């Protein structure tokens, strides 16, 4: 546990991680360039020091004082705190990374440009229907550092490219990568950087873990060939482990559900259901669930 943590940005995840760091005995410093009264109230309630829009000298002093820097997902990479952290050898770890380190619960993580909120919710619903207590969190609403404290057996996390960028040991038991399209290039600069950030969902998995990959997305498929975990694919066009046969969703364990029984059955809905089924079964769900 770091003795002094600098949390950059007191949004939803920033407040959550600041609270948990404080409860774990760290001295928490908070930096916010555009604080409002709510941000100030959060800092006061948490009993942490809030520094508002520091100049470069003050920011340098803060970085030098910190043992770790924890940026909120919306902080741009161009923010000088990152260059200073690199120059002064201070590690940068996101809330998702810290939450992973704080729990022994198995994690199912979902990323992708489109569909990740839907698939995250679907997996949690499938597990619950299978009588496996689960909670959805991460980018979906409940910060991951809060979700891992729930009385559940599995945590299902929506994780963005921003959140994955600042991970260095994050290892979901099941990592689902849905797709890649050009997005957030103002933050990443190039689609290759964006895809590389997404690929970190699989980077630290082990052979006993599962990588769920979209066979119809060439970028995802390319990265899947280097995934250290076991890979299961899903798709509607290319050959895949999870697919539709005669109007029925099927996977290695057998038939799941008829397309006609899905609440929504557009192609992307079917693909989402395939991905969610693969992940939920790997996390302890049942075909009935």
Model feature map: region roles:
Residues 59-66, 73-215, 219-230:
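Phosphate-binding loop of NTP-binding sites
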Residues 32, 51-54, 93-97, 135-137, ...:
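Beta-strand->loop->alpha-helix junctions that form or flank phosphate-binding loops
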Residues 3, 8-10, 44, 62-63, ...:
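Adenine nucleotide phosphate-binding catalytic loops in nucleotide-utilizing enzymes
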Residues 11, 34, 140, 216-217, ...:
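Residues in the short beta-alpha loop(s) of Rossmann-like NAD(P)-binding domains
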Residues 1-94, 98, 265, 285-288:
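N-terminal leader/targeting and accessory segments in enzymes
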Residues 23-24, 104, 126-130, 278-284:
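Alpha-helix C-terminal capping segments
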Residues 12, 35, 114-115, 141, ...:
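Short, glycine/serine-rich, charged loops/turns that create anion-binding
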Residues 16, 122, 143-145, 272-278:
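Short amphipathic alpha-helical face segments that pack within enzyme cores
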